[in-house]
Amino acid sequence: MSVTPIEELPSLGDALEDAKRAASYRAVDENLDPAKHRVVGIGSGSTVVYVAERIGKYQASPELKAKVEFICIPTGFQSRQLILDNGLRLGSIEQYPEVDIAFDGADEVDPELNLIKGGGACLFQEKLVSTSSAQFIVVADSRKRSPQRLGTSWTRGVPVEVVPSAYVRVLRDLHGIPGCRSAQLRLGEPGKAGPVVTDNNNLLIDADFGPLEDPAALHARIKALVGVVETGIFAGNAAKAYFGSADGSTQTLAR
């Protein structure tokens, strides 16, 4: 397909953006197959901007334009806008509950491909789309790759999406889980007075458990609390992760 190879692209003039673009473009180039991928999940965050951009370039290429139309499923307001801005067809998870492939970013990735997500407050919809996908691909710059356990590089805690009326109880219950160092409601300051509100009109709590010995077990423990909608621990469903560097190179982690 007639898209410019990554190696031939000029620098964006920002090393971090070059890294994000490299990871995203490489992930799309190596995994998106128009012959079998029609429904595509588009995640949230600053790195996924380049995923939508690359898929948009493929969709606009003469080889694909008249033959295949990707249907892109957003994980929130931002990704919905990315889909539209790149000339892609917008779908919904209600219309297409089975997603062929999904691309999303991460706040931290451990050596076992477990993730912490939710720094951008879209974690429930991100998990809905990623777990509905036959193949889930993670894109990030190299800072997000942790050589050790989750919670080593990302030190802001595990994001927990909660029903607004339950946040006080959930805060109390989180403090009762062994290993919880702190738990606090995420505030929107300085841009917004009051708490951060998710696209689902829920609130977010950030719960610090330090480095996580068993991410799946902690997710299950938190998810069982009354009032919890979802956690930002993504354990076991990512197939591959791409990490971009400032020089345009990428590293890959796969199951």
Curated annotation (Swiss-Prot):
Kindly state which reaction or reactions the protein catalyses. Answer: aldehydo-D-ribose 5-phosphate = D-ribulose 5-phosphate
Give any Pfam family that matches: Rib_5-P_isom_A
Q: Biological process (GO) annotations?
A: D-ribose metabolic process; pentose-phosphate shunt, non-oxidative branch; pyridoxine biosynthetic process
Instruction: Give the domain of life.
Output: Eukaryota
**Positions of disulphide bridges:** none
Q: What is its EC number?
A: 5.3.1.6
The protein's location, in the record's own words, is: Cytoplasm
- Taking the first listed entry, what is the main subcellular location of this protein, grouped into a coarse class? cytoplasm
* Record's protein name: Ribose-5-phosphate isomerase
Organism equals Eremothecium gossypii (strain ATCC 10895 / CBS 109.51 / FGSC 9923 / NRRL Y-1056) (Yeast)
